[in-house]
């Protein structure tokens, strides 16, 4: 796969552990790529669910994917401030079709006031049993929750105000 460059549009596909397609985002604009990560933006992006329901994202969001960490981060930019939705997920892979990852159900929501909430624990436990997540995956995900919380608490990477401003401004430059 040719590495997408700044200003290119890619598709993002989220799968479940059993290999079923979970969700697809069309036309995510790439803001930056390097050997380990991709930063992009969704702005009124078409999302298709596994049951073919479709919806469009309401606000611009900076998305961050990494090849080594078991999470991805969505910084949702609203008038009242930035909030975050973090998916516990496999590191991404990129092929000719899309950026792809496995969604492991657990999510961390960070509200604009900094409050954090772990979401979908019951869904994770149900899928862990039904889809037979290996113990290694369970351990990796729990360790990555700790890394993610450290990033949040210390405003690392996508959780810094500067990060969101830099990439949101870059998006506006590219879309002209």
UniProtKB/Swiss-Prot annotation:
Report residues binding Mg(2+) 2.
105, 107, 120, 123
- What class does this enzyme belong to in the EC scheme? hydrolase
Q: Which catalysed reactions does the entry list for this protein?
A: a ribonucleoside 5'-triphosphate + H2O = a ribonucleoside 5'-diphosphate + phosphate + H(+); a ribonucleoside 5'-diphosphate + H2O = a ribonucleoside 5'-phosphate + phosphate + H(+)
UniProt-annotated catalytic positions: 23 (proton donor)
Superkingdom is Bacteria
GO MF terms listed in the record are: magnesium ion binding; nucleoside diphosphate phosphatase activity; ribonucleoside triphosphate phosphatase activity
Co-factor(s): Mg(2+)
Hey, which family's this protein in?
Belongs to the Ntdp family.
Q: What is this protein called?
A: Nucleoside triphosphate/diphosphate phosphatase
Q: In which organism is this protein found?
A: Lactococcus lactis subsp. cremoris (strain MG1363)
